[in-house]
Amino acid sequence: MICEVGPRDGLQNEKRILSISHKVELIDRLTEAGFKAIEVGSFMNPIAVPQMADTDEVFKRINQKPGVEYGAIIANLKGVERAFLCGCKKVKLNVSTSIQHNLANLNKTPEESIESFKICAETARNKGMDISGSISMAFGSPWE
């Protein structure tokens, strides 16, 4: 299934932080447009990714339509907990093939990330959440 990642990947590096209501409107319009999978945001450190600091509240306010999968990226156990508490039912773990990119995003090597993801995946599964994974920089990296 193709997942629309604009609300997360498209907004996370913007200098201007969109309001919660604008993010909710964007996601609701994507739902109305017929997308079956939408990446709402991420549960990363709010200091590191301030554009995603309000993902918890966005999840609570979007109009979730049956048959549409709403998910988010997590990086650690705190992210799993935040996702669970706001009703997120699908989390994604992401690792980069680029050591420099992975260090910049997660402050860990790809190998360290994969190891730490094991407990995240187990915890999410025990909470009844769906889990997926993704690989960044699979076809090359401008970081190296």
Cite the ranges covered by each PLM segment:
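Conserved N-terminal beta1-alpha1 strand-loop-helix module at the mouth
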Residues: 1-43, 51-57, 61-67
